[in-house]
Curated annotation (Swiss-Prot):
This is ATP-dependent Clp protease adapter protein ClpS. InterPro entries: ClpS (IPR022935), ClpS_core (IPR003769), Ribosomal_bL12_C/ClpS-like (IPR014719). Coiled coil: none annotated. Binds to the N-terminal domain of the chaperone ClpA. It comes from Cronobacter sakazakii (strain ATCC BAA-894) (Enterobacter sakazakii). One of its GO terms (biological process) is proteolysis. NCBIfam families: PRK00033.1-3, PRK00033.1-5. The lineage of its organism: Bacteria, Pseudomonadati, Pseudomonadota, Gammaproteobacteria, Enterobacterales. Involved in the modulation of the specificity of the ClpAP-mediated ATP-dependent protein degradation.
Length: 106
């Protein structure tokens, strides 16, 4: 194996380019929206299954969704947030519930 470490040389990068290369990824909030039809127990199940909340925290978030109209389930990188939104929405449809999960930039 070659001991050439020229690929580690960042001197050729401008300071702005280096800063851009090291910039942390954009983060996105995953949000559950309230509706008048999805059972509270199903919302708790979703929060436990897809966001790994214990029953107490899942219940608190479900009540936030119910009384305030929405709740932030977590903040993730774009790919993780998009995946969670897609999985939650698919799971809700498979179980004949109109529960809506969305994302927005944090």
């Amino acid at each position: 194996m070659s001991k050439d470490k020229s690929w580690l040389d960042f001197d050729h990068l401008a300071e702005d380019d280096l800063r851009e290369a090291l910039k942390p990824p954009s983060m996105y909030k995953v949000i559950l929206m309230n509706d008048d039809y999805t059972p509270m127990e199903f919302v708790i199940d979703v929060l436990q299954k897809f966001f790994s909340y214990d029953v107490e925290r899942a219940t608190q978030l479900m009540l936030t969704v119910h009384y305030q109209g929405k709740a932030i389930c977590g903040v993730f990188t774009a790919e993780v947030a998009e995946t969670k939104v897609a999985l939650v929405n698919k799971y809700a449809r498979e179980n004949d519930h109109p529960l809506l999960c969305t994302l927005e930039k944090a």
